[in-house]
Structure formats: C-alpha cells, structure tokens
Curated annotation (Swiss-Prot):
Biological process according to GO: pantothenate biosynthetic process
Catalytic residues (UniProt): 182 (proton acceptor)
Role noted for this protein: Catalyzes the reversible reaction in which hydroxymethyl group from 5,10-methylenetetrahydrofolate is transferred onto alpha-ketoisovalerate to form ketopantoate.
Keyword Magnesium: yes
GO molecular-function terms, A-Z: 3-methyl-2-oxobutanoate hydroxymethyltransferase activity; magnesium ion binding
Intracellular or extracellular location(s): Cytoplasm
Cofactor(s), by name: Mg(2+)
Assembly description: Homodecamer; pentamer of dimers.
InterPro entries with a match to the protein in the record: Pantoate_hydroxy_MeTrfase, Pyrv/PenolPyrv_kinase-like_dom, Pyrv_kinase-like_dom_sf
Designated name of the protein: 3-methyl-2-oxobutanoate hydroxymethyltransferase
Enzyme Commission number(s) of this protein: 2.1.2.11
Amino acid sequence: MPITPRHLRQWKQQGRPIVALTAWDFAIASILDEAGIDLVLVGDSLAMVALGHPTTLPLSLEDMIHHVQAVQRGCRNALIVSDLPFLSYQTSPEDAILAAGQLLKVTEAQAVKLEGGYPRLLETVQRLVEVGIPVMGHVGLTPQSVRQLGYRQQGQTPEAQQQILDQALALEAAGAFAIVLEHIPDRLAAMITAKLSIPTIGIGAGPNCDGQILVTADLLGLTPSQPPFAPAYLNLRQAIGSAVQRYAREVRDRQFLQSQPAEQEPLS
C-alpha cells in the first residue's frame, strides 16, 4: 500500500517508529522499497555521494528531477520526498511554488523538503501548503547553509536551542507535515518531538525522535569518511574495491573465465 504523509502522522500517534533512508537512483530505491522502508528521501546529498561535489550547493532543479524520476521507478510503496535544491525556493514564495510545482508535475514525488525556519521561509511553507504541495521541514544542521553555519552540531547554547524549538513549532503552524531534526542534542530533539503533533525524523538527533533517517551511502559504508552520527552497517566501499581488484587481477593474469566450460567450438 502506498504510504502518504497522513500515515506518518498516524504512526506518531500510535508510537510506531518511522524508517527513512535516502536514494539517488533506481537500483538503491528498489532495494529500499523491497526492504519495507517507509520514506525515501531524494536528498540533495546526492550532489556529494552520487555526483562528487564537495557540498550540496551546486545541485540544480533539473538534477533533482532527473534523480527523482529514477528513484520513482524503483518505489511502489515508500513515500517519496524530494529536497528542493539551493536557491530554488529561498528567493520568493512564488519561485518556490514554481520549482516545487514543476518537480511534482513531472515526477511521482509526493512532497518536498525545505531547510530552515526563518520568517520568509515560513511564508513560503504556508503558500506551498495552500496550493496543495505537502512540505517537510528541516531544522538544526542545514547543509544548504554550510558556508554560514558549517557542519558542526547545532543547538549548543540555551539561546540556540530555543531558536530551533521555535522554528520547529513555527513550521508546524505553517503546515509542514513532518520535520527533519539534524545533528542537534538528544535532549533538544526529545523536547521538540514531545511538543509537536507532527512527526520528527532524526539524523544525528538521538533515539527519541518519531523516526530516523540516514544517508544510504553512509549506512552502507560507501563514503570515504563517516559522519560521527551515522553508523555504517557494511563496509561496501571496501567490498566493492576488493571485488574490482580481484576481477582486474584475473583479467591481467589471463585467469578470467578460465574455469568456465567452453561454450563455442573452435573455428576451423
């Protein structure tokens, strides 16, 4: 059964944890969907893990559309949420509506995710919801603000914690159906989760959120360096490297396929 934003709210009320991961292509998306993942985020992190950029900032709306279309072909049941890339929504609510509308028209994403909780963004969230576009919020560490805030944990002072709490409450009031809490203290995430009626999805925010999300490349150990809050369940980078090296060695030593029976008669 296809999952919708309404299911996430029901699960929060029932105390059922929400399981989310990121995807950037058909192969990963189909594996996640078959494994029963609830929410697949086509995150702008794909700029780094799939396209090799040092940050998420270079990603374009056209890039996002391309990858969402690949992901949707692999998902039958998971809720697909797409990030809106940097500067596709920050300039004005009208630009945000056009960007989100274009993305949802040509893909099967059911919602978009926006970073931050400043007043102008709250107006944008409200306007998007008014025209029928579901919005997921994102507070704490916001990668699109990396040049201003860096990648360090957010909410380390009482004032910063209050600001993040206020942003989360304001995003709920503006109509967001869920909020990602990234790299903030566990206690702050638990407090926000208790105060909101919409689900919180944590990444580096402790165990007390309504759900959890990781970048799948981190989960699988594909990235050269691991974020401090992201456990690797495999070392797939090493496994792939070993397989490729073995293949290369067999080809160079003329051992590749030598153990296979001949399938063709020699030419006369």
